[in-house]
UniProtKB/Swiss-Prot annotation:
Top-rank taxon, per record: Bacteria
Family: Belongs to the IS21/IS1162 putative ATP-binding protein family.
CDD domains linked: AAA
Organism for this UniProt entry: Mycobacterium tuberculosis (strain ATCC 25618 / H37Rv)
Residues annotated for ATP binding in this entry: 108-115
Keywords: ATP-binding, Nucleotide-binding, Transposable element
Further remark: Was identified as a high-confidence drug target.
Presence of keyword Nucleotide-binding: yes
Protein name: Putative ATP-binding protein Rv3427c in insertion sequence
GO cellular component: plasma membrane
Length: 251
């Protein structure tokens, strides 16, 4: 049963203080029972509202990120593959690379969990309040190519330069056209200038990326800065994917 004045409820709705509204009855009951003093009552309501706003903001950031799946380190099975550098990956979860404005490169064979780890890292960034974005490299390049065609390139590339951290998944999958190489150069240069990290996942080792660019000058200018200032993690071993397939049984 509600013990709250309807006029107060309406005022909280008008002020968009739904966090306070949702917990007001419980906080009033705590106060009447002597569990909270008057100042503690106000502080509790304030914390309830802050928690509600932070939760709503995180939900919005995760929606804008366009993840393939909501992946976190808590649901990643580090024991599935003894070859994974677990200590190095957990160190990345501390986000010191983010504070330093440094990028991360996760490379290795298909199915070892590179995309999961990348998304888990930016999920942690989002929980800390940063805007993040996930993109398949090929789809991003196709999107930017469309911008050249309809003269919306500047608007489209801002979607990838604006977030604090950008994941480029499946980087260096195939040879790039000159236009794709130029677009990557502009994107990576812009993010480097503003100190916004990238997280790249790739099936190729970074030293094998250079030959995928038609212009070696562009390749060296783009990749040297990126590779030499990034944390490079080799993720090797058996595929992680069979363990995630529905209906799989273990012996």
């Amino acid at each position: 049963m509600s013990i709250c004045d309807p006029a107060l409820r309406n005022a909280l709705r008008t002020l968009k203080l739904s966090g306070m509204l949702d917990t007001l009855d419980a906080r009033l009951a705590q106060t009447r029972n002597g569990d909270l003093g008057h100042l503690e009552f106000l502080q509790a309501l304030r914390e309830d509202e802050i928690a509600r706003r932070e939760s709503a903001a995180l939900t919005r950031r995760l929606r804008r990120a366009k993840f393939e799946a909501q992946a976190t380190f808590e649901d990643f099975d580090f024991t599935a593959n003894p070859k994974l550098p677990g200590a190095m990956l957990r160190d990345l979860a501390a986000l010191r690379w983010l504070d330093a404005g440094e990028s991360v490169i996760l490379h290795g064979p298909v199915g070892v969990g590179k995309t999961h780890v990348a998304q888990a890292l930016v999920h942690a960034v989002a929980r800390r309040g940063g805007d993040v974005r996930f993109a398949k490299t090929s789809r991003m390049l196709s999107d930017l190519a469309g911008g050249h065609a309809d003269r919306s390139w500047g608007q489209r590339i801002r979607e990838y330069t604006k977030p604090l951290v950008l994941i480029l998944d499946d980087f260096a999958m195939r040879e790039h056209t000159a236009m794709h190489a130029d677009d990557l150069y502009e994107l990576i240069s812009d993010r480097a200038i503003t100190g916004k990290p990238l997280i790249l996942t790739s099936n190729r080792a970074p030293n094998n990326w250079y030959g995928l660019f038609p212009n070696p000058v562009v390749a060296e200018s783009l990749l040297d800065r990126l590779i030499n200032t990034s944390h490079q993690i080799l993720m090797d071993g058996p595929s992680y994917r069979p363990r995630k397939r529905p209906g799989r049984t273990t012996s």
